[in-house]
Amino acid sequence: MVALVLAALALVAPPKPHIVWKPIPFGPTRLAQMKAYSERHYGIDSYVLHPRAIVEHVTATSSFSSAYNTFSADVPDAELHELPGTCAHFIIDTDGTIYQLVRLDVMCRHTVGLNWAAIGIEHVGLSDAQVLGDAAQMRSSLELTIRLMWRYKIPLADVIGHNESLSSPLHKELDAAWRCQTHADWKRADMNVYRARLVVLARRYGMDVGPPPKLRPTGCG
């Protein structure tokens, strides 16, 4: 059904935006940590990512370097105290520069419950509104996201904000203590604005990306 909805051979393939490859250290040790994390939290004995969703984030920092350095350091995160360290596949700076930090076939720790299935895109900024109002950053974000949707046949329903993670049908978490963990960035109202802009861009390339995600009960308070 998803394949039919996407019909995703677009009339015109969305162009690949300019991406600066700036990898964080992700050698054998971190890969092994990611594999162990995946086994603990998803029951998947692998660090290999097969993208089925895209999660949008806000860095809560005012500079690219601050976010990059946080992701580069493979240390236990301050919130959940696990390895590997947190990371995202992309960071989009306020001037619209897209940096890729991690290969798209490798899982990254950016969203509890969805790291097994989702590409993570971070936007340098302090709020959803700031990112939505930054023309250069928003243009790059939409161009990157629509290209990834086309490449991996990801429907609009699986392009979500971090704050929407618990309602994703792809969400799964084996650790009960983590099952309801999420963050405040990219609330549904802001993501509805973002997704509406994506739909406009998708039409330009003849892409039928399907409907937006439905609200689902999360079982969390």
Predicted features, each with a name:
Residues 14-30, 48, 127-221:
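Basic/polar, cationic surfaces and motifs that engage anionic cell-wall
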Residues 54, 112-123:
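Short coil-to-beta-strand
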Residues 59, 124-126:
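Short strand-loop junctions, especially beta-strand C-caps/beta-turns
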Residues 71-75, 107-109, 115-118, 140, ...:
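General N-terminal targeting signals
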Residues 2-10:
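Sec-dependent N-terminal signal peptides
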Residues 9-111:
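N-terminal catalytic cores of peptidoglycan-degrading enzymes
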